[in-house]
Swiss-Prot record:
Pfam families linked: polyprenyl_synt
Pathway: Isoprenoid biosynthesis; farnesyl diphosphate biosynthesis; farnesyl diphosphate from geranyl diphosphate and isopentenyl diphosphate: step 1/1; Isoprenoid biosynthesis; geranyl diphosphate biosynthesis; geranyl diphosphate from dimethylallyl diphosphate and isopentenyl diphosphate: step 1/1; Isoprenoid biosynthesis; geranylgeranyl diphosphate biosynthesis; geranylgeranyl diphosphate from farnesyl diphosphate and isopentenyl diphosphate: step 1/1
Job of this protein: Catalyzes the trans-addition of the three molecules of IPP onto DMAPP to form geranylgeranyl pyrophosphate.
InterPro entries documented for this protein: Isoprenoid_synthase_dom_sf (IPR008949), Polyprenyl_synt (IPR000092), Polyprenyl_synt_CS (IPR033749), Prenyl_diphosphate_synthase (IPR053378)
Cofactor(s) this protein cannot do without: Mg(2+)
Subunit structure, as described in the record: Monomer.
Transit peptide: 1-40
Keywords, in A-Z order: Carotenoid biosynthesis, Isoprene biosynthesis, Magnesium, Metal-binding, Mitochondrion, Transferase, Transit peptide
EC annotation from Swiss-Prot or TrEMBL: 2.5.1.-, 2.5.1.1, 2.5.1.29, 2.5.1.10
Protein known as: Geranylgeranyl pyrophosphate synthase 10, mitochondrial
């Protein structure tokens, strides 16, 4: 045969082989497509209502947080400051993720509630520190004056440190008849790792202010910041929940990878909202990263490319959920969609 005929023959053969493979694995393909590529609006296909799930989990977490930080003397002022940030209106994404991960691997909500509260305490602590004048210098958080504006910098710092201590205490002081001590130890190790990540990410964030980066080094710098800063607590939330629920090492690592993806995605979306929404819409000061000269995803790649990157991270996050029970994984699939589509 002539070269052209040989080429056509090879192309047709490859096409037929791919067609055979597609039809052979079509049932699995359909499972993956139905589980991982639906938008949030089609979550009803799971017979699963994500917003109701999220609200119910938030109510359970809020009740536990309220009980964990009672007002008492002599540290009344510190506890008022702790409660001010900890109990302020929030979506409770991190504790919800912790509880969902626990349930995904076969555990019960009650088993992971202490860990869920602990992760929210760490989150509240990080918000107080982030807003300080020596850090991000912000005066608005969740639609209210930031902690140091209300209580002063010294009380805010003490409240932040007290929340970290309380997070550890919350995880270790509770006794679980059905949870081996080594699981408790592992959750504490994950918490410590998350705090280390927050510190490293914040330091890199501050160091990068006003610096110029090309596209490659800029993306590398951003990924380092937000894997350690934004993604750290989401990663810890998922892993701690999976550990408490008795997940296997493989399940834990897959959930870690999933959470890292949605953590980065959360930050990409946050950066986009910072330049496209008002302070009233966000409940915090809009455009402050631009004013501070911080490196952000829109600054590095533009708003539209940033949105595309968030969508790619959403797909990647979903891929890490393959193999889990289709019904139990619905909250995490929907959470990824919720994060990529959020407006504040």
């Amino acid at each position: 045969m002539e070269n052209r005929e040989v080429f056509v023959y090879i192309v047709i053969s490859i096409f037929r082989s791919l067609q055979f493979l597609f039809w052979r694995f079509r049932p699995r393909y359909n499972d993956v497509t139905s589980a991982l590529t639906r938008p949030l609006t089609s979550a009803a296909s799971y017979d699963f209502k994500f917003m109701s799930y999220m609200v119910n989990k938030a109510k359970s977490v809020n009740k536990a947080l309220e009980e964990a930080v009672p007002l008492r003397e002599p540290e009344l002022k510190i506890r008022e400051a702790m409660r001010y940030t900890l109990l302020s209106d929030g979506k409770r994404v991190r504790p919800m993720l912790c509880l969902a991960a626990c349930e995904l691997v076969g555990g019960q909500e009650s088993t992971a509630m202490s860990a869920a509260c602990a992760i929210e305490m760490l989150h509240a602590s990080s918000l107080i520190l982030d807003d300080l004048p020596c850090m991000d210098n912000d005066s608005l958080r969740r639609g209210k004056p930031t902690n140091h504006i209300v209580f002063g910098e010294s009380i805010a710092i003490l409240a932040s440190q007290a929340l970290i201590a309380l997070a550890v205490q919350k995880t270790t002081s509770s006794t679980f008849a059905d949870v081996p001590p080594e699981r408790i130890l592992k959750t504490v190790q994950e918490m410590v790792k998350a705090v280390e990540g927050l510190v490293a990410g914040q330091q890199a964030d501050l160091a990068g202010e006003g610096m110029r980066f090309d596209s490659d080094t800029g993306l590398e710098h951003l990924e380092f910041i937000h894997i350690h800063k934004t993604a750290a607590l989401l990663e810890a939330a998922a892993v701690m929940g999976a550990i408490m629920g008795g997940g296997s090492d493989e399940e834990i690592e897959r959930l870690r990878s999933y959470a890292r993806c949605i953590g980065l995605m959360f930050q990409v979306v946050d950066d986009v909202l910072d330049v496209t929404k008002s302070s009233e819409e966000l409940g915090k000061t809009a455009g402050k990263d631009l004013i501070a000269g911080k490196l952000t995803y829109p600054r590095l790649m533009g708003v539209e490319k940033s949105k595309e990157y968030a969508e790619r991270l959403n797909i990647e996050a979903r891929e890490h959920l393959l193999g889990f029970d289709i019904d139990k994984v619905a909250p995490l699939v929907s959470l990824a969609d919720y994060i990529v589509n959020r407006q504040n």
